[in-house]
UniProtKB/Swiss-Prot annotation:
Keywords: Bacterial flagellum, c-di-GMP, Nucleotide-binding. This is Flagellar brake protein YcgR. Acts as a flagellar brake, regulating swimming and swarming in a bis-(3'-5') cyclic diguanylic acid (c-di-GMP)-dependent manner. Binds 1 c-di-GMP dimer per subunit. Increasing levels of c-di-GMP lead to decreased motility. GO terms for molecular function: cyclic-di-GMP binding. Belongs to the YcgR family. It holds the Pfam family PilZ. InterPro entries: PilZ_domain, Split_barrel_FMN-bd, T3SS_YcgR, T3SS_YcgR_PilZN. The keyword Nucleotide-binding applies. The gene is ycgR. Monomer. Interacts with the flagellar basal bodies. The keyword Nucleotide-binding applies. GO terms for biological process: bacterial-type flagellum-dependent cell motility; regulation of bacterial-type flagellum-dependent cell motility by regulation of motor speed. It comes from Nitrosomonas eutropha (strain DSM 101675 / C91 / Nm57). Residues 134-254 form the PilZ domain. It is found in: Bacterial flagellum basal body.
C-alpha cells in the first residue's frame, strides 16, 4: 500500500548543498532502462512519486510490473484519492528511488489509472531516460520499526526539563529523517542548528552504537502513515560529522541491510 508523504514549504537551501552534490549519468537505452526498473521491482524498493519537478508532495509507491512490449510501467496506487486525482489530471510524475544503493531518478508521462491483479494501479509510459546518482556515502536506509533508532535533542526545553527524543525514519551518512508524535506541533524549525544531539543505533536487543552530532534542520513537513496518523517529519543534515561517527553509521546501515536480506530469504522472496 502506498503511503502519502507531504512536505511543507519550510525547506531551506543549504550552503553546503554543493558539498554533497552527487555525480550522475543518464541511461537512454530502452533495454537498460527496463533492466534497472525490473531490478527496482525485484528489490521491492519504495518510489517517491512527485507531482512536479519542484513539488514537495509525493506518494510513496512501488513498481508492480514492467511491460517492455506495451512500453508500460505499472506502479502501486496511492491511499489518498485527492492526491491521486491531482496526479492523474497532470498526467506526469517525477520518480525517485534507489537500486543497489544508487539513487535513481526518472520521469513518467501519460499517467493513467488501471486495474492490475484486481486492484487500482498507476500506469505510465516507460521513461525515455533514467538518471543514476552515483555517490554511495549518502545512501539512505529505512530504520527498524520494531527496534527503532532514536535521537535525543537537548536545549529544546528548559534546563530542568527532560530532553526531547525522536524516532528515526531513515538515516544516511549525510543526515536523517525524524518523526514526531501524531498531530504534534513539533518544536523543531527549518534552518535551526542543534548541537550535542545523541543518536542511539540499536542492535540485536542491545545498543549497537551511540554517537553525538551537530545537525541542521533542512525541512519540516508531514507524513501520513498507513494507519492514517499524520505525523511531523523532520529532515536533518549532519554538520561536520566526525569520521568515526560516519563509520558507525555506515556499519549500522550495513547491519540493517543484512537483516533485510535475511528476512527476505526466510520468507522466500
Amino acid at each position: 500500500m502506498a503511503i502519502l508523504q507531504t512536505f511543507s514549504e519550510q525547506t531551506i537551501s543549504s550552503a553546503r548543498a554543493s558539498d554533497i552534490k552527487e555525480p550522475d549519468y543518464s541511461v537512454n537505452s530502452r533495454p537498460e532502462i527496463c533492466f534497472f526498473l525490473n531490478g527496482i521491482m525485484e528489490e521491492k524498493s519504495l518510489i517517491s512519486l512527485y507531482l512536479a519537478r519542484d513539488s514537495h508532495s509525493a506518494i510513496l509507491s512501488s513498481i508492480l510490473a514492467v511491460d517492455p512490449q506495451q512500453k508500460l510501467l505499472i506502479m502501486d496506487y496511492g491511499i489518498n484519492e485527492t492526491l491521486n486525482q491531482i496526479a492523474l489530471k497532470r498526467g506526469y510524475l517525477r520518480c525517485i528511488t534507489s537500486h543497489n544503493q544508487i539513487r535513481i531518478e526518472f520521469d513518467c508521462d501519460n499517467l493513467q489509472r488501471v486495474q492490475f491483479e484486481g486492484r487500482h494501479a498507476f500506469s505510465a509510459d516507460i521513461p525515455e531516460s533514467l538518471k543514476r546518482l552515483q555517490r554511495r556515502n549518502f545512501y539512505r536506509v529505512t530504520t527498524s520499526i520494531t527496534n527503532p533508532a532514536v535521537c535525543t535533542i537537548p536545549l529544546l526545553r528548559a534546563a530542568d526539563e527532560a530532553p526531547v527524543v525522536y524516532s528515526l525514519l531513515d538515516i544516511s551518512c549525510g543526515g536523517m529523517a525524524l518523526i514526531d508524535q501524531p498531530d504534534a506541533d513539533t518544536l523543531l524549525k527549518a534552518g535551526t542548528t542543534l548541537e550535542h544531539c545523541r543518536i542511539d543505533l540499536p542492535g540485536d536487543g542491545n545498543l549497537f552504537s551511540s554517537i553525538e552530532a551537530s545537525i541542521q534542520i533542512a525541512y519540516v513537513g508531514t507524513v501520513i502513515l498507513n494507519n492514517g496518523n499524520t505525523c511531523p517529519r523532520i529532515g536533518c543534515e549532519f554538520i561536520n560529522l566526525p569520521e568515526k561517527s560516519r563509520l558507525l553509521i555506515q556499519r549500522y546501515i550495513t547491519k540493517l541491510e543484512q537483516q533485510a536480506r535475511k528476512l527476505e530469504t526466510e520468507s522466500g522472496f
